[in-house]
Amino acid sequence: LFAFDACKETCTDIPNGKKRIALVIPIRDRWEHLQILLRNLVPLLQSQHLCFLIVLAEQVIFHSTVFSSSLLDRFTLKAPGQPFNKGLLMNAGVIEALNFMPFHCVVFHDVDLIPISSNLSYACPPYPRHLSTQIDKFNFSLPYVGLVGGVLFVPLDQFLRVNGFSNMFWGWGAEDDDFFER
């Protein structure tokens, strides 16, 4: 979890129409991608004077029920070879963000998608909005109707209304298709 000092100041005096957003970034062994994303995304968010919190959600296995920080480091292992559960991580990211600050909108952001335009608004819409509709690897068009993976804005009340993402999908994909259907 992190919020920049300048953003904390912005959070105390939110301009009309601006809302607090939590960005949840599920990650697995893509730390170089994360550095590139943050170098590009944070200045964009700051230039839009948004109040934001970024939550990094990494899948780990706990080998201890003791959760003090020193023991947590010793008894936490990454989950190599374990199937990825992106839906579970995104749900956990929302819960952690709610423990840190109240927010109106959650943005689920894949770590390997970089905004290519400074005109791309990250302000919270009143309805779910798929932001990554033009990805270079898909020749700037969606491969199928209903794709909402990549970068997705969801007002918190609507996310809670559908009970978040399913935790039942292991491996890459399907959690966002299920979310779209609900």
Predicted regions and their residues:
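Short, flexible loop/turn elements at secondary-structure junctions
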Residues: 27-29, 61, 77, 135, ...
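N-proximal low-complexity "stem/linker" segments adjacent to membrane-targeting elements
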Residues: 1-43, 47, 67
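Conserved short acidic donor-positioning loop in nucleotide-sugar-dependent glycosyltransferases
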Residues: 41, 59-60, 111
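Active-site machinery of serine-nucleophile hydrolases
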Residues: 46, 52, 132
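Short acidic, S/G/P-rich loop/turn micro-motifs used as interaction or catalytic elements
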Residues: 30-32, 63, 113-115
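Surface-exposed beta-strand-to-loop junctions
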Residues: 15-22, 51-57, 70-75, 155-163
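Conserved catalytic core of nucleotide-sugar-dependent glycosyltransferases
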Residues: 81, 85-90, 94-109, 113-182
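Active-site-proximal specificity loops/subdomain of glycosyltransferases
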Residues: 35, 49-103, 138
